[in-house]
Amino acid sequence: MNVPCVVGMNEVAWQESRGIMHASSGQEALGVGVGMVPSGVSSAGQAHGNNPHAMPPGAPSAQVPLSGRSQDDATVGYFFQRQAGEQLNGYSNKHRWPTGDSIDAAVRSVDEMNHDFQALALESRGMGELLPAKKFWEHEDPAKDGQKGMFLADEWRENTWGASHHSMSQPIMVQRRPGQGFHGNHDVASVLSPRSESGGLGVSMVEYVLSSSPADKLDPRFRKGVFSVRDCELDGPEKGEQKCKASPFEEEKKRDLISADTDNVSKLNGRGLPNGIESDCKDFNRTPGSRQASPTEITERIGPNSISAEVLGQHQNPMSNKPLSDEFPSTESQNLDGMEQVGLHSLQFDYPGNQIQMDSAGAGVGLFDYNTQQQMFQRQNALTVQQLTAAQQQQQQFTLAAAQQPHLAGMFSTGLAPAAFVPNPYIISAGHPGADPYTTLAGPAVVSPQYYGIPWGVYPAGLFQQQAAAAAQAANSNNQQAATQASQGQQQVMRATSNQRPLTPNQAQQGQQPESLAAANQAQIFGQGLATSMPGYQLLTPTAYYDQTGALVVGPGARAGLAAQVRLVASAPVLLSPAAAQAATATGANSLTGATNGMFRQMGPQQQQQQQQQQHQQQQQQPNANLHSNSFYGNSTMSNNSQSSSLFSPGPGQPGSTSLGFGSSNSLGAAIGSAFGGFGSSVGNSAGSSGSRRDSLSASCDLYKRSSSSLAAIGQPYYNSLGFSSSPSPISMPLPSQTSGHSLTPPPSLSSHGSSSSLHLGGLTNGSGRYFSAAPGAEAKYRSAANTSSFFSSNSQLFPPSRLRYNRADIMPSGRSRLLEDFRNNRFPNLQLRDLMGHIVEFSQDQHGSRFIQQKLERASPAERQLVFSEILQAAYQLMTDVFGNYVIQKFFEFGSMDQKLALATRIRGHVLPLALQMYGCRVIQKALESISTDQQSEMVRELDGHVLKCVKDQNGNHVVQKCIECVTPQSLHFIIEAFKGQVYVLSTHPYGCRVIQRILEHCTPEQTLPILEELHQSTEQLVQDQYGNYVIQHVLEHGRSDDKSKIVCEVRGQVLVLSQHKFASNVVEKCVTHSSRTERAFLIDEICCQNDGPHSALYTMMKDQYANYVVQKMIDMAEPAQRKIIMHKIRPHITTLRKYTYGKHILAKLEKYYMKNSPDLGLLVGPSNGML
């Protein structure tokens, strides 16, 4: 099996067989790069345990052990690339950390990482040159050279592992603490590495790549990076007799530690591999600079069952030596390496240069490092007075800066303020119910580089400023236990109970009742310290946690079963200002209701009083901050002239509404309340002061309304919004209304301007609701599919909306709403009528939207038709005159119920004349006349009385009058006949009037048509030759009575030759020949056969004429046989001549049709078709 790997930018292949390779010319014929193995050499010939090594050029060949791989793996510059075919192997009994997460893995900027990775790949001395290498270790007697510890200075045999020849001065993604190395060596320069002076990162990358390479028979001592005498392939006495030569790195290792590689020791590092792949005996792991600390060296430093004093600052992990819960089923010891301070360089976003610096809160991982100075991790054993004072002053400076510079004010709402107190342990949050950390990912498209360096469900506890809890202590003198617990910060929040996964929003939170007093205390602490009436900072609360005594403390509301655990995580620590804590003490002292003020909407008469107090405090505390804000969750009885601003709004809120909370025009009541427990369900459904029900996330929510602010808070589009997540990735879910004009540039890897990249709640879907793996590299395969996924789409698996969450105020530059724009761009292939609520009128006025509605209305249910009808009824007249909207109205006249037709007819009433004269309204009138009842028809037609001639002569109105004549009973049309008196000739010669005259002749009674026909007979000669009047005469010949036809024929007789050569009259002559009686037809034919036109007969003249030849053809068709014989004899002398004329050929073609059979009495009248006689 060949697995490709990148070596020095050359593609090579690993060979499964490890044959012995011999060197030629003093150097081995390396398998790397050549991809070949000498035939005849069996892999069984090598001794178990031989490590890959190679002989450097020029070295004596006597000391070169034969090996399967001819070159040391770590000396080759590997490009940092995961094996594409590697898949997760399951998590039944291993550590279940999320893929890609590592506790000590830090993040650096994308540009820097790309540069360093490429530098490693290009570090090879030549594209084809093979670097010198040496063996890492081999089997030999440990007592031969004595015990040697790992990573002692200058232990490399040759300069390959000597002084660094890499251009980097520090390892990638590692910042060293001054004066201390990773392995206890205080001289950083003495730690040597193949790729850098202090980290050995290049080797760790080699491990990372080689860990997934196929190595069926690799020595088992490499299992989990431990050098041991264990052998996966040897059992019984053979295993006990196997001896190994100590590695140069571990020559001073204690003998008792050599045999200490048991399962517990091998699994000392509880994190497993960084990508979550299960390690086995085939893994190649331990080299200098490995990402996993060596178990042996950890054992040397801290012992096999103790945890480093540097882990999590001063706090120990209570769960480290306990059997884990169902989330982490492994019963192994969970010992973590010492945490190293790692900083993140400035993000590649357009933040200002003078960003506010902040400490890494509690985790020892620098989440942010903003170009100012690096905040090293400080161990805080106690809160001194100087720290309290300095923190208060620093917070006051930030508040003053926000007041003076409004554009920086938003930084405080996203947690970009320094953490003054960081004695908290990790907090394990409650994930989304049923969510699996291995199948969920909270980014819209790709994995953002801002991952927490901690496992799933755990995030730094610096999100809660302890000063707020300490301030709340003054108001809770009767609850000293809970206050002490909060001030000490010894909190470890867990998911739910130890044996229970999060419940659904409608289920009771069972198993969370025992600690009622602690929960009540916690409710006061969070109510006062975290959700005061002070606006500004983003809040986060756990669902439950263990206090210092081991008691399970459940967050307020969660015990009542009002909401399931929905994780709300920001990408930065979220702090409370000291002013907020002071305000909590002032407003909520000795009062539980005051403690929860600002956190939940007040229930009862005290609500307005609390809101007035909040507004009064805000006016005093922030007179110049340009943040006209209410309490964090807003008020539900705000005045119309008030403004609100919320952390979750992309700018100042709309007047008279709240951007987040329980306001009367807002329904996102329990966005964070779902984590608190709230007064609502998982995502709202809270009631306003009026008591009316509002659907969650309705279109009235200000989250989806455009903000008048031109510059939102820094980082707001991807740190705010609905922070639902079951993954430790940063919350970066912009709302549909957020465009580039509303905020600074979002993270480059996230799509923030499409409704299709909105919120991903609980998992990563491919747009059709199907989940797929969130394993490293999987996002690239589904990146395009993830971009089309949307929390607001109609196929959402978690919260199927009743309709798409679009707001009518969200207008695109084209003038269309975002929903219509997305529909026109084919982003909603399964759009339904119910998804268009609020947009029916707009869609009806769009070409594609109107066609969509028309098609749906034909097959829609009565309920769906009524939904559409309720919206278009108010804009009925507007749609009737719209180029596309009129078709929707017509569809309702065609497929609507009688009540709907009656309602639309009522809308037409009083507007018949203007609609009849309008280009599109006239179509609606015509469709209405076809659909409504007789009484409604008569009522509608009467509006045209007095305006008949105006409508008849109008290009649109004439169609309405024609439809009236066709559909309405003749008795109701008497006013139209009266209007035509004395105007028949004029109207007959009118392009539109002639049509109305024909409709009258077709549908009206004889009594009504008689006066019209009398006027027509008086002007027959003129009308016959008129371009429009001839149609009226033809219509009388076709549909009139016999008397009327005879009168017209009499007018034509004697003028057949002349009228037949007229462009318009020739049509009337043809109709006379066709519809006249046999006697009248004979007179007309004899007239052309007997009449002479100069030297030739009239028939010859007519055969050559462009119009009269059609009359001759019609006579041949309609003539009696005797007359037809006469016509043939008259035509025969002119056959040769007719071939010279274009129109004469038409006559010859007609003759061929009837007489090609060579009638015996006529003989051969027509020659061959080729013209030869």
Swiss-Prot record:
Main location group: cytoplasm
Keyword vocabulary terms for this entry: Cytoplasm, Phosphoprotein, Repeat, RNA-binding, Translation regulation
Region (Guanine-nucleotide binding in RNA target): 1066-1070
CDD domains in the cross-refs: Pumilio
A Pfam family it matches: PUF
Residue numbers spanned by region Uracil-nucleotide binding in RNA target: 886-890, 1030-1034, 1109-1113
GO cellular component, one term: cytoplasm
Name under which the protein is recorded: Pumilio homolog 2
Naturally occurring in which organism (per UniProt): Xenopus laevis
